[in-house]
Amino acid sequence: GAHLGFARGWPESPVRQGADLVIQSLHKTLPALTQTALLHANGDRIDRERIRRFEEIYQTSSPSYLLMGSIDACVRLMEAKGRQTMEAFSLLLDEFHAGLAGLDQIVLSGREIMRQGRMKDYDEGKLLIAAQGTGLWGGFLYKEMLARYHLQMEMAGDSYVTAILTPWDKEEGLMRLS
């Protein structure tokens, strides 16, 4: 996620972890327009000249200045306020998870899996809402979340939906989700 690595308590960004090539979709978790992303070449194992050749093949001769401006504004914002924004988001997520402690039927994966030692790290902004054994299926949950609660889920599986929570989600939306 493009939002990772800005504050303690969150996983490090793949760039800082040493990934050779990273594509960060800004529009998923940061305040940037849809279709915006950054490509990072990291270290000396990447042939940058080869990347430039492919860019020449696939890039447009008429770039969207609106999208490029959105990328620039997003990067500037995160440079100036990224840590502060992510720390405030962490506090909001703590409140959100505390409000979900008494759920009987629906399982929220993530923190519990971490406590069991089955995962090294995870992004608390990704929420897997699993409904195994409830008689509900993911497609139904997906549609209900939108129709009844005005919440757009990222995707649906057989027995779950995935939500992506961001620092720019309103507390009101998180309360509807809880």
Where are these regions (language model features)?
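Conserved C-terminal alpha-helix-loop-beta "cap" of PLP-dependent enzymes
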Residues: 95-178
